[in-house]
Amino acid sequence: MLQTAPARSCAPLTARRCRNCWPARSAAGWLRLDRTAIEVDHCAAGALPIVALIAFLLGLILAMQAYVQLRVWGAEIYIADMVGVSVMAEIGPLMTAIVLAARSGSRNAAQLGAMVVSEEIAALEQMGIRPLAFLVAPKVVACAFAALALSIVFDLVAMCGGALFAWSVAGIELDAFAEQLRQALSVSDLLVAQGKAATFGLAVGVVGCALGLRVKDGSEGVGRATTNAVVLGIFLVIVIDAVFVTCQRMLVG
């Protein structure tokens, strides 16, 4: 009779193959750059049209409200100051983070929650693949990068909207508007605003992924995690913004 060799588990071999076939990893091996690029494309490129539209309309609205108040004293030129400072310091990073929480935070929670329910996360762990490196880290880094990039776009488009209103209604030339913006804003303002935006994006990414990985109760739990990711993400962003403003005022004195 033919003797058959005892069956051996292929899990260790599969795990080794999966670990060795990961392309485009960082030097530390903790972040998959190829997956991060895909997530950045979804977070940033996917949200770009709605962010640009909101920014343009808010720039128009802010300039309109400022014009109503400033024309009483003949100080219409300061429309640029009000639009530039308010957009860069607060509205730009906040609105970008809110859009990101609604789109990417909810998506991350739903995607990871569905993977938990279908036991895909457990399967990755059995194969020796770290879910934090394979799934979570790319999403969190992508949210931070997308928030930074979208905040810059938001600021530029909103100021264009404000400049368009100032030129068409208040009679302010575009070069005068730009010069007033240059005087009102500084490099430190830009750095603080973009640091704030990146922190907001990081918070949105962490909240969405954390809630997704903690899903229980099947599809109902996925829906609950998705809703909570948006609500908690926006709440956390506002809390972080309050901390930023408080610390900034304490340092400035």
Describe the residue ranges of each PLM region.
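Short, membrane-interfacial amphipathic segments enriched in basic
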Residues: 1-36, 211-212, 216
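Membrane-interface helix starts
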Residues: 26-36, 41-53, 234
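Selective transmembrane-helix segments that form parts of the transport pathway or gating/packing helices
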Residues: 44-52, 136-159, 230, 234
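Hydrophobic alpha-helical transmembrane segments of multi-pass membrane transport/permease proteins
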Residues: 50-65, 242
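Membrane-interfacial helix-loop-helix connectors in multipass membrane proteins
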Residues: 64-89, 156-198, 202, 206-228, ...
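Membrane-embedded translocation segments of transport machinery
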Residues: 76-114
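Short cytoplasmic-facing helical segments at TM-TM junctions of multi-pass membrane proteins
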Residues: 111-137, 219-222
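Final/C-terminal transmembrane alpha-helix of multipass membrane proteins
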Residues: 222, 228-246
